[in-house]
């Protein structure tokens, strides 16, 4: 019988970012209790030796599983040290992979207080609304003019430490274009 391959999207992430993610998840599970329903699975609880950890986030009758890996093949650059993250949505026997933005939106729908679009309608109806959004990573678009006006009145409260964002975990901070301050290009290229 032939070998069968299963392809999975694994976001290449540096080790320090994964460690920060794990610390934030554990802090909000055990200390702040904002993520008390989440489940953290250690590497020694997994049968796969490449799995570093798993975070199971219940979403109603489904769940989001964020798996961190170690010991993968290194990437093209020196800092790609064989660490990675996969994000999976599971419901009963069905599972699919999701991108970090969608993962943050799914987390935001089920956890953390939010001052959202529905706040405008609820405010007009005289209902009490949450004064601010605790999980800004869950919003990926610019709100309506009314939403922006109401949000401008209420400054977001900085939560220390911040809530764990999947988008922030998988963000590629190495390949972004560098920003130089003050100078308009190279001195040698400008002829100065």
Curated annotation (Swiss-Prot):
Q: Where in the cell is it found?
A: Host cytoplasm; Host cell membrane; Virion
Q: Which residues bind Zn(2+)?
A: 108, 114, 133, 139
- Recorded GO terms, molecular function? RNA binding
Q: How is it modified after translation?
A: Highly phosphorylated on serine and threonine residues. Thr-96 and Ser-165 are phosphorylated by the mitogen activated kinase MAP4K1. As the HIV-1 replication can be activated by stress and mitogens, these phosphorylations could be involved in this process. Ser-144 phosphorylation may inhibit elongin BC complex binding.
Q: Tell me what effect the entry lists for residue 108 to L.
A: Complete loss of interaction with CUL5
Motif: HCCH motif; annotated at: 108-139
Q: Where is the composition biased (Basic residues)?
A: 176-186
Instruction: Note the effect listed for residue 148 to A.
Output: 35% loss of interaction with CUL5
PTM Phosphoserine: at which residues? 144, 165
Say where the protein is mainly found: host cell
The stated induction of this gene product is: Expressed late during infection in a Rev-dependent manner.
**Which Pfam family would be a valid example here?**
Vif
Coiled-coil residues are none
Query: Where are the annotated segments for Disordered?
Result: 165-192
Which residue positions hold the site described Cleavage in virion (by viral protease)?
Answer: 150-151
Effect upon mutating residue 50 to E: Strongly reduced interaction with host APOBEC3G and APOBEC3F
**What are the start and end residues of every segment in region (RNA-binding)?**
75-114
Quick one: where's region Interaction with host APOBEC3G?
40-44
* Subunit-level organization: Homomultimer; in vitro and presumably in vivo. Interacts with viral RNA and Pr55Gag precursor; these interactions mediate Vif incorporation into the virion. Interacts with the viral reverse transcriptase. Forms cullin-5-RING E3 ubiquitin-protein ligase complex (ECS complex) by interacting with host CUL5, RBX2, elongin BC complex (ELOB and ELOC) and CBFB/CBF-beta. Within the ECS complex, Vif interacts directly with host CUL5, ELOC and APOBEC (APOBEC3F and APOBEC3G) substrates.
Extra facts: The infectious clone pNL4-3 is a chimeric provirus that consists of DNA from HIV isolates NY5 (5' half) and BRU (3' half).
Q: Which family does it belong to?
A: Belongs to the primate lentivirus group Vif protein family.
Print the domain comment field: The BC-like-box motif mediates the interaction with elongin BC complex.
Q: What is this protein called?
A: Virion infectivity factor
What gene does this protein come from? vif
